[in-house]
Amino acid sequence: HDAVRPLVSQRILNDVIEALKDHRAIDVAIPSADTIIEVDDKGYISSIPDRSKLRRGQTPQAFDRQLIADAYERALKDPQFKTTDDCGVVRKYSDEPVFVVRGEESNMKLTYREDTYMLDKLFQLKNTEPQDISHVGDIFRDKVAVVFGGSYGIGKNIVEMLEQSGARVFSYSRTENHIDVGQREDVARALTEAHEQAGRIDYVICTAGVLNKEPLTTMDYATIQAAVQTNYLGTVNVALEAHPYLKQTEGKLIFFTSSSYTRGRAFYSIYSSTKAAIVNFVQAVAQEWDGDGIKINCINPERTKTPMRQKNFGIEPDDTLLMPERVAEATLRTLVSDCTGQVIDVRRKVEN
């Protein structure tokens, strides 16, 4: 059951495999944040070990095949054989030292019923860092991208960066060419136009969204409807209309959420709730469309310097905000990745 660690990260797996190049036995462990005590038969503390030297074991473990085979061969001949894991077998029945790779607190084990509830919540909040794109070369050259919300802010930076990378980009927005993602027929018309002119569509990116910072009770109902129409139904419309084109190319679909998706915030309840809905939608549709070869992910930038933010929050110091160019770069990184159904965090680089 110790192998049931559904949140094991790719970093841990990579580090374990890399360690096998120099070591024949590998364990994964993390420091103990709690004091560990040893208790005697009567229930009293008999010793308090120095926790700086203690680690909590995790998985995976990895071994040279012949090493662990020989260790188990000896163990099974021992009538007193008793162990809790493979590293214990190797330590007891061989002279090979076991190298320890750093684990992660989130790499928790599913053992008790209560663990399922905690893991389910962690799965909901699971996010991913965008991968490096320095090695991708001309991967965007001759690709065709459609960007909704490409006239300003993050969308405009994505358009510019894709064009600089050699892609053919079609940009649509209400201000640019009267395309409203809240209207399904507008989305259909835009995608049809792009496909007729380019012959294919490889990427569809939707950055379109509206934010109204206002108490719910003072919001005009038409404003509420418009926000839901653009932020959430716009996402649904883009996904539905993009599906047949992206199925042909096994393409990529990108939407945008907000850091407020994990917890609603006062004075922008509609915005926060639609952003939470987008995450849930992306996770669900990623599963539905996996067989079609379509990768769908969600970019989650922290507070970003955009016209929409400035309109609602005024002028803020640049060093407290993420620049839209960094979000655009993270979006391109996500386009070249194989992940799907993920929330991609984009954070400021904080200098020490």
Give the role of each language-model region.
Residues 215-216, 220-225:
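Substrate-binding pocket helix/loop in short-chain dehydrogenase/reductase
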Residues 7-99:
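Conserved core of the sugar-phosphate nucleotidyltransferase
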Residues 263, 284-294:
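Active-site-adjacent segment of SDR/Rossmann-fold oxidoreductases
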Residues 207-213:
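Conserved NAD(P)H cofactor-binding loop of Rossmann-fold oxidoreductase domains
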Residues 298, 315-352:
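C-terminal helical subdomain
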Residues 151, 159:
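N-terminal Rossmann NAD(P)H-binding glycine-rich loop of SDR-like oxidoreductase domains
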